[in-house]
Amino acid sequence: MLMTTTTTAMSVSLSHDVIIAAAQRAARAIPPLWPLASSVAVNPFLGQASEPLEMAAARLRRASGIAVTMPRHWYAERLQSGEITEDDLRAPLQNAPAALRPPSLSALRHAIAATRPSPQAIPTVAELARDTAAVDWPGIVNERIGHWAAGYFDQGQALWAVGRSGGAYSTWRIIATHDLTPEIAGLAGFARYVADAPANAEDAIVDCVARLGLSQDALDGYFHRLLTTLGGWGQLGRYRLWQAELSGATDACVTDLLAIRMLWEAALLGNGGCALVPGWRTAIAAYAEPVAATSDDVIDSILQEAAERAAQRKLNAVLAAPSPAQVAAGRVKLQMAFCIDVRSEVFRRALESLDSGIQTLGFAGFFGLGIGHRRFASDVVEARLPVLLAPGVITCAGDATASAAASDLSARIAARAKRAWGRFKLAAISSFAFVEATGPIYVAKLLRDGLALARQHAPNEPAPRPADGLDLETRLTMATRILKAMSFTGGFARLVVLAGHGAKVVNNPHASALHCGACGGYSGEVNARLLASLLNDSQVRAGLAARGIVIPADTLFLAALHDTTTDAVTLYTADHPSPGHAEDLAQAAQWLAAAGALARAERAARLPRAHRSQDIAHRARDWAEIRPEWALAGCQAFIAAPRSRTAGRDLAGRAFLHDYDWRYDDGFGVLELILTAPVVVASWISLQYYGSTVAPESFGAGNKLLHNVTGGIGVVEGNGGILRTGLPWQSVHDGQRLTHEPLRLSVLIEAPPEAIANILERHPQVRALFDNRWLHLFALDDEGLIRPGFRRHSRPSLRVAPFKLYRGQVAS
């Protein structure tokens, strides 16, 4: 085996710093992956936000061999049906780069009818070795790395934990030096090669760069390519870096993974000898070429934007139509604040239709409380806030009393006994006799669960509280900030319900993805209960009154949990007993039950095999149900405006609705918060659905029916290999057609355009999302219609055109 070949050393020696800087840039070109316990939607194009769609298409074609738009026939069908008009095509055609766009509308139509070339990634050494040796080296590499990574990243699923001392690279070297699988497959001397490799991951990368003969220009593209071949394992390393940086630290896991992958490459090149050299020379030259969009990339970008303009026209028509909603005279009877999640739109519309005295509000589901929460009888701190932020307050469940401490101890003992029993069931020896010895005990449970007869209960832990207590000034500042951010500083009803949301499903590894994204992949009742307690505090209310926010003495704030799978709402009445509100609570319960029935009936029409609203509750308990709900499939728009602009209008559960009134936003601090937090979170959700639809092979989690949970952190298809990311195919497709229309999010904000522009100037990373059209930005006038807004253009490799204002219509 030739492990020290220099026949491919075609470049001058590169410095350590240059190589590692390229590795770090490549690490930031891939998105992070959150573990299953707290999975949240992530923008798969996070590393490409600084460039437009056509450039991202060119880059990801080289790195992953994928297309980032739908096939041409998808757009052709919409053009033929009239859904996309010539006007929709004309504007993006005019804005496209002149050197690459079709010369005319007829030429563009001709291009739509043509078949787009299949995207091809630049090959790795493993792929070249597969083609020359007829051995599936990419599959073997993925399988062996996945086998090790499942144990290394395990979060309690494995019975035997893998040692983690020294980091990922060091741990892998120990395993790899004893793994003979590569040598059996034909990679002679691999274990010895790994043993002789540098002990430090960065040094190993530098050494492999020399062995592979990489030029400086090829580094970024090649490193990016290798990290994409790792799938979710590389993204899990990126997640560790993300989490470390939130606290001002760093993490080398993703660099370690790159070093591991490069050792495979260098070993395969040395083993392949001269047979691989010509193909590898060609690949290096391709990696070194600057990334450049092609005319096909530009055509696809034009078609994608045309589809989005068509959707924006429809949305504008809905907003312009007369609203059937009626405004109650006098004090409203019930106010209910929901998360901005698109699933809340259906329930809010249903609830408001029952009585003109009902008013709903939309706000980010963590309710402005950036908390790390410890559940009852647990020491694990759950970050129940947007993943862009770090917790500022630690909370826990239950009072600090002797009886609570005794209950806590009892619950911990029970949990340990349950874990011990679970490990006994799976142990190497006892597992064989377990079924025969204890099977009859489980008959009733199996029947109950298998027939979906088991009852499900909403989370009902003891009321949460700050772990260390908060002084009055801190509590008052929090309450003031939150109420102003909600545009909710007056007109309080007797009963104000703060509804977090979650999803109660069974046998679903991605269950946390159905919870509240703003709560970090957890359900939102903890945040809602904390805020209700804060706003019921008499001292806080007195302080708020001194600041001009007067809450009537008869106003009761109460937390609730909206189950988005069944549209059942749980009221946490025991948190704040109030006999004087018994009638209000009874009426609210009736309204919520009626609204739930209306919402279920509307959602049942979209769900396969849900012929009646009663079927929905059954689906939530069905072990075999792969589509208990559609979650956020179909999300299309984000609207920040007073509720009166959208009340009574059927937005079909496709819009994030955030209450905002700029007239009460002195200095536009709330607007800045909306643009830099909820809008960004919504963009991550939208683009995850987009990526899982247009490129399911790379940005989707594959087929739910084949999923196996590995390490408690993610899923693989089948018995192992690459960790899958994104959404399962069943989350965007009903078996016959797509249920998610892949459109980039349209952001509509009722605010002065100048204020929006000033905020974006201060936040270049957010501005880049609009400049490069990962998001579309519009401003609404005082009647809730599109008025002068933004259509920004920024093409770094081409001449930069200034952004334009447009009036009264969706225009360029």
Swiss-Prot record:
Binding site for Zn(2+): C339, D341, H501, C516
Localization of this protein: Cell inner membrane
Disulfide bonds: none
Bilayer topology term: Peripheral membrane protein
Named cofactor requirement(s): Zn(2+)
Family annotation (InterPro entries): DabA
Gene Ontology MF terms: zinc ion binding
Keywords: Cell inner membrane, Cell membrane, Membrane, Metal-binding, Transport, Zinc
Cellular component GO terms held in the UniProt record: plasma membrane
HAMAP family the record matches: DabA
Record family assignment: Belongs to the inorganic carbon transporter (TC 9.A.2) DabA family.
Subunit architecture: Forms a complex with DabB.
Name of this protein: Probable inorganic carbon transporter subunit DabA
Protein's organism: Xanthomonas axonopodis pv. citri (strain 306)
Upper lineage: Bacteria, Pseudomonadati, Pseudomonadota, Gammaproteobacteria, Lysobacterales
